[in-house]
Amino acid sequence: MSFYRSSIISQIIKYNRRLAKSIICEDDSQIITLTAFVNQCLWCHKRVSVSAILLTTDNKILVCNRRDSFLYSEIIRTRNMYRKKRLFLNYSNYLNKQERSILSSFFSLDPATADNDRINAIYPGGIPKRGENVPECLSREIKEEVNIDNSFVFIDTRFFIHGIIEDTIINKFFEVIFFVGRISLTSDQIIDTFKSNHEIKDLIFLDPNSGNGLQYEIAKYALDTAKLKCYGHRGCYYESLKKLTEDD
């Protein structure tokens, strides 16, 4: 794992008590360090995403299938043509079929790669807009990505989890704050109202009691942490996200 100087971890440690031991989970493209804290003082940071790990009424974990892979977004974003080509040729297995087809035409290259359709799973959330607090950010992102109104979402704000994500393919780091929550809908009801959009292709539902992969490991750590005593917290136990937005 490469060295990374977090933009907010020193402030988090200073004002929030550590709740659980840190863990590291990884796969072939990401290394994620997770640390849980009692929510005593948390604020929005313009460079840190806020995400929610949400359980449905039929006990499923809601995960989003990102439309564009992180690698594809990086290839499109970078202006360095050499870097574009290098990422495409070396890591095309980490693209989905449509992305490989688009980039093959763009570069007039046909890299030797498996004909797989890679899934990029993420939890709903994103970076707060200017002036947004945590509840407002979560409300907007969950509505935009999953089409769920905040009146159906309940967030446990007694604690939060700080994550440092190292993307070993594009060689970049990202920070995220996770909250645990519940949705007063079944997975089928969520699927019925979901509309594919420019960010999220479709939805995935995980079993919290069995599974594998990064998203399962993150959820397991979060749900295990939720069982701990959060002494000194300044949050709420599964408060309505709508009410949290109105209160703030």
Curated annotation (Swiss-Prot):
Short sequence motif Nudix box: positions: 125-147
Entry keyword set: Host mitochondrion, Hydrolase, Magnesium, Manganese, Metal-binding
Required cofactor(s): Mg(2+); Mn(2+)
Range of residues in the leader sequence: none
Single GO term (MF): phosphatase activity
One GO CC term, this protein: host cell mitochondrion
Principal location listed in the UniProt entry: host cell
Transmembrane segments: none
Pfam families per record: NUDIX, VD10_N
Location in the cell: Host mitochondrion
Top-rank lineage group of the source organism: Viruses
Annotated ranges, domain Nudix hydrolase: 45-227
Function as written in the Swiss-Prot or TrEMBL entry: Acts with RNA polymerase to initiate transcription from late gene promoters.
Family: Belongs to the Nudix hydrolase family.
Name of protein: mRNA-decapping protein OPG122
Gene from which this protein is expressed: OPG122
